[in-house]
């Protein structure tokens, strides 16, 4: 039987490995909305999602933080400011927590995975739309002199459809991946999930 110290060590190692995997994945990104090609999708949230179901929400958040921190160290941020990396971290948390809450409470059936994914996508879209309007876009305009045009149009026709599409793509990959890994996640997760249909 594993001691608490051994379990904690394995948890920290697992989070570190998944954080490194997430950092690798963030470097492979692509645009999806015409006109805002600087907004790009990547699948670096997948290790965070896996980690969340293995180690709980704090584990998933820690993995997202490690990814964003390593990416900031690698790139130096935006003129030295971690605007994009902090935004990426907030986006991950906004998607992860509603997804985890729904699946943990309601169960791991396909319908509940879809429900959790929809909750995560809508939360992600709402949070990032507000954050871009009031904080992120103004910061980019101030730091990089980057003009996005009329703010409301940028959010409505750029940020909002981008995050809806991003949430959809991440959700599809998550549902497929969870279906493949479900027995292993249920067996090895530190937090027991409701397996009811």
In which residue ranges do the predicted regions lie?
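Loop-helix junctions at membrane interfaces
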Residues: 1-197
């Amino acid at each position: 039987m594993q001691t608490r110290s051994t379990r904690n060590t394995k948890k920290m190692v697992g989070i570190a490995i998944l954080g490194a995997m997430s950092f690798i994945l963030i470097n492979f990104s692509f645009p999806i909305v015409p006109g805002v090609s600087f907004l790009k999708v990547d699948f670096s949230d997948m290790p965070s999602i896996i980690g969340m179901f293995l180690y709980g929400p704090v584990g998933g958040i820690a993995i997202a933080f490690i990814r964003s921190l390593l990416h900031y160290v690698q790139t130096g941020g935006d003129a030295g400011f971690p605007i994009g990396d902090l935004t990426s971290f907030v986006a991950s948390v906004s998607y992860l927590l509603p997804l985890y809450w729904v699946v943990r409470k309601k169960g791991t059936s396909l319908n509940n995975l879809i429900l959790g994914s929809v909750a995560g996508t809508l939360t992600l879209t709402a949070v990032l739309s507000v954050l871009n309007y009031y904080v992120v876009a103004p910061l980019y305009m101030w730091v990089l002199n980057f003009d996005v045009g009329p703010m409301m149009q940028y959010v409505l026709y750029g940020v909002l459809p981008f995050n809806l599409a991003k949430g959809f793509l991440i959700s599809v990959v998550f549902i497929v991946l969870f279906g493949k890994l479900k027995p292993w996640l249920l067996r090895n997760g530190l937090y027991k999930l409701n397996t009811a249909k």
